[in-house]
């Protein structure tokens, strides 16, 4: 039985503009891929034929933020990529929604103690649906899209624009969704660690074997001043050992 056959007068269907527009929007989502780490592989797998994302009306991934209405953030959000993510979000037309896919996009995941990792995408842009997992399977992302469709179905936004605070100032920097202290750390490029994470001393650097001074280590990036101290310490150690060897030969 078709939809029109359920009514006595098949030529007329009474509904509200909200329901009509929401029905069209939820069944014609244009996702914008914002893959940052390993969760992006599962996001790409969701668009493959064996998952058939098109049956939910969201199978066409937009190539431009100006043609998209759903941003899927999958992966670790660093302070460097936070600026790019916010600019892409600002370029998306209203109405727009955001899906945070994976533990890293939700709360930082296993990398939340990194110096440049934000505790989730919702620190800089508003998130509508969270899809947990490390990484979540394609079925989980599909369920997240279905959850977003249910949310869109209940929205009322015809005739007005949903209020969204400005996320970027005149210079293109993140403002609204970050505390002043955290924004200052990001803008100055300083190390950022969430509350409760003990900050490692900047003077002590654990160097991996086989890597030159100044490269990535087990604890992260080496600050320039610590890098110089590390080089100076190694040079002093080498000269000291040479003096000791000369002393032994003289004895």
UniProtKB/Swiss-Prot annotation:
Query: Single GO molecular-function term?
Result: NADH:ubiquinone reductase (non-electrogenic) activity
> Which family does the entry's similarity section mention?
Belongs to the complex I 20 kDa subunit family.
The protein's name: NADH-quinone oxidoreductase subunit B
Where is the region Disordered? Answer: 208-251
Reactions catalysed, as given in the entry: a quinone + NADH + 5 H(+)(in) = a quinol + NAD(+) + 4 H(+)(out)
Biased composition (Basic and acidic residues) is annotated at 242-251
An individual GO BP term: aerobic respiration
Q: What is its EC number?
A: 7.1.1.-
Q: Which PROSITE patterns match?
A: COMPLEX1_20K
Per its UniProt entry, what is the enzyme's top EC class, as one word? translocase
What membrane topology is given?
Peripheral membrane protein
Subunit field text: NDH-1 is composed of 14 different subunits. Subunits NuoB, C, D, E, F, and G constitute the peripheral sector of the complex.
Q: Which residues bind [4Fe-4S] cluster?
A: 38-39, 104, 134
> Which cofactor(s) does the record list?
[4Fe-4S] cluster
Q: Name the species this protein comes from.
A: Rubrobacter xylanophilus (strain DSM 9941 / JCM 11954 / NBRC 16129 / PRD-1)
């Amino acid at each position: 039985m078709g939809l029109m056959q359920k009514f006595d007068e098949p030529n007329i269907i009474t509904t509200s503009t909200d329901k009509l527009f929401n029905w069209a929007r939820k069944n014609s989502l244009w996702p914008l891929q914002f893959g940052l780490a390993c969760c992006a592989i599962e996001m790409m797998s969701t668009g493959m034929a064996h998952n058939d994302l098109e049956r939910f009306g969201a199978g066409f991934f937009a190539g431009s933020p100006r043609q998209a209405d759903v941003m899927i953030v999958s992966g670790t959000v660093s302070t460097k990529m936070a600026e790019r993510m916010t600019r892409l979000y600002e370029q998306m037309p209203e109405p727009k929604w955001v899906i945070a896919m994976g533990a890293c996009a939700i709360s930082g995941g296993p990398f939340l103690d990194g110096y440049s990792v934000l505790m989730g995408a919702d620190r800089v842009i508003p998130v509508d649906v969270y899809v947990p997992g490390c990484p979540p399977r394609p079925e989980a992302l599909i369920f997240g899209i279905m959850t977003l469709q249910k949310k869109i179905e209940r929205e009322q936004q015809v005739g007005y624009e949903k209020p969204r605070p400005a996320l970027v100032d005149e210079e293109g920097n993140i403002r609204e969704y970050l505390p002043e202290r955290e924004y200052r750390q990001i803008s100055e490029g300083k190390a950022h660690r969430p509350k409760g994470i003990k900050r490692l001393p900047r003077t002590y650097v654990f160097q991996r074997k086989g890597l030159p001074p100044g490269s990535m280590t087990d604890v992260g990036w080496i600050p320039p001043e610590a890098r110089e101290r590390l080089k100076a310490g190694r040079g002093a150690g080498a000269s000291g050992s040479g003096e000791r060897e000369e002393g032994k030969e003289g004895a």
